């Protein structure tokens, strides 16, 4: 990855804006200090190498931090607080905007919710007639490689929420987001069940590690 000694990330942020910073520089500002004999920039780089990316660092669970040198419980709680702030920021945006007009924000929000789960979780976003998100609900939790989904229960919750449309999502704990034939089959069943109640299924996102696949983008819905 590499970093140039002598750079001052805080000064760079003030002069050029936060968007000018690299992931290493952003993380270094957050960490504030390094370790004895280890510059904070080097520590930030080492952490990003260990976790793979800034996103994976932010969404890692507590057990992953036990082996991370330089990140104690205090830093862990700060990182999780930032992740939760990000999730709430995305939700507030989706509650005010048409979710289908900003699929990237929807995908990022669902990644924050599902990407690092160790079991398959099937989640539904309930939307009003303007495609603003009313709420989300984890409908079903399965094993590491499957989850049993009941379309009628999804329809029932949609009616309770007075939802006009839905966005479906589930994760693949393996990290690979490519949908299976079973994923496509259950999506078709849910679409048909919802149409009987004049509820539209707008998309189904399969969430991996740092990636997702949209059924709508592939023309499957």
From Swiss-Prot:
Disulfide bonds: none annotated. Zn(2+) binds at residues 170, 172, 183. InterPro entries: MPN, RadC_JAB, RuvA_2-like, UPF0758, UPF0758_CS, UPF0758_N, UPF0758_YicR. Keywords: Hydrolase, Metal-binding, Metalloprotease, Protease, Zinc. GO terms for molecular function: metal ion binding; metallopeptidase activity. A motif (JAMM motif) lies at residues 170-183. One of its GO terms (biological process) is proteolysis. Residues 99-221 form the MPN domain. PROSITE patterns: MPN, UPF0758. PANTHER family: DNA REPAIR PROTEIN RADC, UPF0758 PROTEIN YEES-RELATED. Belongs to the UPF0758 family. YicR subfamily. This is UPF0758 protein PC1_4100.
């Amino acid at each position: 990855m590499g970093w140039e000694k002598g750079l001052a990330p805080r000064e760079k942020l003030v002069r050029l804006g936060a968007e000018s910073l690299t992931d290493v520089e952003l993380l270094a500002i957050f960490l504030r200090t390094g370790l004895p004999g280890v510059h904070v920039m080097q520590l930030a780089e080492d952490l990003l190498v260990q976790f793979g990316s800034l996103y994976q660092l932010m969404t890692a669970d507590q057990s992953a931090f036990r082996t991370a040198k330089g990140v104690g419980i205090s830093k862990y709680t700060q990182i999780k607080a930032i992740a939760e702030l990000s999730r709430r920021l995305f939700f507030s945006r989706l509650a005010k905007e048409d979710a289908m007009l900003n699929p990237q924000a929807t995908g990022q929000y669902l990644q924050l919710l599902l990407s690092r789960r160790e079991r398959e979780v099937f989640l539904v976003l309930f939307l009003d007639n303007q495609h603003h998100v009313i709420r989300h609900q984890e409908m079903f939790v399965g094993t590491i490689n499957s989850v049993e989904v009941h379309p009628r229960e999804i329809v029932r919750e949609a009616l309770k929420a007075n939802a006009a449309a839905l966005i479906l999502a589930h994760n693949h704990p393996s990290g690979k987001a490519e949908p299976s034939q079973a994923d496509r089959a259950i999506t078709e069943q849910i679409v048909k069940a919802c149409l009987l109640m004049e509820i539209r299924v707008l998309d189904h996102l399969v969430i991996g590690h740092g990636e997702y696949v949209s059924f709508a983008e592939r023309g499957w819905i």
